Amino acid sequence: MISPQKSIHYGRYEFKKWEQVDAETIVEAPVSLTVNGEVWLTFMCTPVDLEAMAVGFLYNENIIQHIDEVADARLCEHGDNVDVWLNRSVEQPKSWRRTSGCAGGLTAVETLARVDVSFNPHKPKFDPEKISALVENLFESQELYRETGGVHTSVLSD
């Protein structure tokens, strides 16, 4: 099984000083969806409630209209594939219409394997005060974030 969290060690800048922190972080992992024995796609997701996520995805994409159409939904032994069997045959859509998120919520696992996400072991080469000011500026400019408390966003600075 894939754990939904992992321990990390990082440097945190707070109150004008650096400190080393041990903490837990949420994991995102590639999890494939197999429908009636055929691999359909791979999600990037936090690996919890995967059977429900898979069935919900099929409902959201209008593949199924009712839970009674699902004969079985089972997480594989390693936790990286959800196998859903429907009580009827279905064809895999050519595209996904309703899934939101970056890249439609889907990913190419081989692309992920090429990404280097390791931490830089060297001291930071940026001014933490500047980063704090930029984050504050970002939050000030995000009206929807202030209203809801959560929005994916990005910033570019020199």
Model-derived features: where do they sit?
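Intrinsically disordered, low-complexity regions enriched in acidic/Ser/Thr/Pro/Gln residues
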Residues: 1-157
